[in-house]
């Protein structure tokens, strides 16, 4: 004679064969930090900002010449306006070889640090940069202004340019001339006589220019 298990026994047996509950642990996501650009500066804990780059585009009037470009030792004499204000500074000379520490940025350097007002908490900065595939010499075949220099700016914008020497110009025969002495304004037209071609060569002192925001 077989004895039938009571109800309590059946329930205990059923519980023994139930699958163990699945434990779900919270998934921890690690945030990946994006690398900081050396040209971006943290000021008072603010996140890094992208700094705009302005291109100096020129269209000189050439006679008997095929190209015009900055020479070695050429400084940039610029006028600036305050990005977040109305202050302006004129005739500021920027030396591409000069290096100054960027405020509140470890190891970063630039070519110009300036304040429009002594009360400004944060200084404006400018770096002379090389934009590959964009900057080049102006040629006699160009019909519009071309970019010959680039400036990465924070807190200021370039609004004016005074050409200062030296610049290098070339003839079709490959003869090169320096236009203007180092650090001197091109206040007058430059002219010379090219013996190889037997023709006069010249650069008009009134050089058309404009600043364009680089969208690279």
Label each region the model flagged.
Residues 45-77:
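Eukaryotic proteins' extreme N-terminal regulatory segments
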Residues 65-77, 81-160:
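Structured domain cores in non-transmembrane regions
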Residues 5-6, 28, 35:
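Compositionally biased, low-complexity segments enriched in small residues
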Residues 149-216:
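Glycine-rich, aromatic-bearing surface loops/beta-hairpins
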Residues 2, 8-10, 42:
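Intrinsic-disorder-associated, low-complexity terminal segments enriched in Asp/Asn/His/Tyr and depleted
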């Amino acid at each position: 004679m077989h004895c039938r298990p009571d109800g309590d026994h059946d329930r205990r047996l059923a519980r023994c064969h139930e699958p163990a509950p699945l434990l779900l642990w919270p998934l921890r996501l690690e945030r990946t930090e994006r690398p900081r650009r050396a040209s971006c500066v943290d000021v008072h804990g603010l996140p890094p900002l992208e700094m705009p780059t302005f291109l100096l585009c020129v269209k000189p009037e050439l006679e008997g010449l095929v190209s015009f470009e900055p020479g070695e030792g050429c400084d940039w004499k610029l006028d600036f306006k305050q990005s977040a204000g109305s202050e302006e500074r004129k005739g500021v000379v920027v030396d591409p070889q000069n290096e100054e520490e960027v405020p509140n940025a470890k190891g970063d350097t630039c070519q110009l640090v300036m304040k429009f007002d002594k009360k400004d908490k944060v200084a404006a900065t400018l770096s002379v940069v090389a934009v590959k595939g964009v900057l080049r010499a102006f040629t006699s075949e160009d019909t519009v202004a071309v970019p010959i220099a680039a400036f990465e700016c924070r807190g200021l914008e370039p609004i004016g340019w005074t050409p200062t020497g030296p610049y290098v110009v070339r003839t079709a025969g490959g003869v090169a001339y320096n236009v203007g002495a180092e650090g001197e304004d091109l206040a007058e037209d430059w002219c010379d006589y090219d013996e190889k071609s037997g023709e006069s060569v010249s650069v008009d002192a009134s050089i058309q220019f404009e600043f364009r925001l680089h969208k690279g």
